[in-house]
A protein has these predicted regions:
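Nucleotide-sugar donor-binding catalytic core of glycosyltransferases
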Residues: 1-245, 250-253
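Short, intrinsically disordered, charge-balanced linker/junction segments flanking boundaries
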Residues: 253-259
Length: 259
């Protein structure tokens, strides 16, 4: 068994990843995940963004300590600033969407799906819709046409543009589109705003290579065809015909939905 230490800030050690492993033992294949728990001699250590306390340590080869970036709304120079550059020096591998001075590997943000939740602790809570459920899911009855999930968050330029776009879509489509989101029309779980809909609009914080978040994955999991605004290289990860790429609000958008 490979023992993997995982540091996940913002959550306690009692969280469960059963949605993603399909069991309560935090085991996937031959890997055991120790989430925010003390383990003295792990085989590998994944750190999501930061550590959970002022100091955190274990006995491990430094080359096996891996940094994983998850945030999608950082400024482009976030990891070029001195405090972050120094922080990244201690990792054997760095996976991030953003530019770094340190040697790094470009990849998508390391985010869980959120279709069974609405952020916070509910992300890592048990659900009957776990990985095994989604692996077997082939069809869902669609009773509605179009939805979007976009909160009223507006503290970055990307948030403001996304919110403006959502207002424009609602003005254009009217009752054809259902708009959900914290501060707008909250949902306990995103499943309720995706699974009943034939189409779903997914808008990222930025139009940046590799910046592909749960916003697209949740649409796939709910079997709702995504109209997607996000990474230019999305087709490096998903078939081109599995989504429609938006270039902001398009004049022929309504016609394309009925194709």
């Amino acid at each position: 068994m490979i023992n993997i230490k995982v540091t996940l800030p913002g959550f306690n050690e009692n969280l469960t990843i059963s949605q993603f492993t399909g069991n309560e033992e935090s085991v996937l294949d031959d890997c055991k995940f120790w989430i925010n728990k003390k383990i003295e001699n792990p085989d590998i250590w994944f750190v999501f963004e930061n550590i959970t306390s002022e100091k955190e340590a274990c006995a491990i080869d430094p080359k096996k300590v891996v940094f994983l970036s998850a945030e999608t709304s950082y400024p482009d120079n976030h990891f070029l600033k001195d405090p972050r550059k120094n922080f990244l020096k201690q990792f054997g591998y760095i996976y991030t969407t953003y530019e770094t001075i340190n040697k790094s590997i470009k990849d998508m943000p390391f985010l869980p799906w959120m279709i069974n939740s609405n952020h916070g602790d509910s992300i890592y809570s048990p659900s009957p819709r776990d990985v095994n459920y989604f692996l077997e899911l082939k069809d869902l009855k669609k009773t509605k046409t179009l939805s979007i999930i976009c909160s009223d968050k507006d503290f970055t330029e990307g948030h403001k543009k996304r919110l403006d776009f959502a207002y424009g879509l609602k003005e254009h489509f009217g009752d054809l589109i259902d708009w959900f989101g914290n501060g707008i029309n909250p949902l306990d779980q995103k499943w309720d705003g995706i699974s009943n809909y034939k189409y779903h609009i997914s808008i990222e914080n930025k139009n940046k290579d590799y910046l592909i978040s749960e916003k697209l994955m949740d649409s796939f999991l709910g079997l709702s065809f995504p109209f997607y605004y996000g990474a230019q290289n999305t087709s490096d990860f998903f078939p081109k015909k599995s989504y429609f790429r938006l270039k902001r609000a398009q004049k022929n958008f309504r016609r394309k939905i009925y194709l």
